[in-house]
């Protein structure tokens, strides 16, 4: 993942270096809201998937964005962080006091400071879908038709599928 302008770069979900001036050298799961102390953006680096999402462990629910990754390469999540400062924003910006995240997507560009222009009379078309989902946890793949989870543990494989309502 990287930040605005690709100035800071980190492995994801386990960060092992410095990202947003925070030392994660011990190996920290920065996909978990509670582990991120400062306001932070995560932008996906060359994702080969057609989805991006956010999952709330406490609520057992999440939101997915689905679009062709060749047309919609931009995948970003923003959080105010889990510090006292971030939790104050959570309280101000949510109905039930957080956590607050922004899921952002981009058509034709992979980073927020990048711009793609339309010429006079030019037209570009695309489709994108936002899907709420629940009870699956973090998923491995999604399309406009279904959300899929497959997880390997010492006891074997487990999984789940949630079809869309279209």
List each language-model region with its residue ranges.
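Acidic, contiguous internal or C-terminal segments within carbohydrate-active enzymes
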Residues: 1, 128, 150
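Residues at beta-strand starts and edge strands
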Residues: 122-126, 155-157
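A general sequence property marking short-to-moderate contiguous segments
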Residues: 124-139
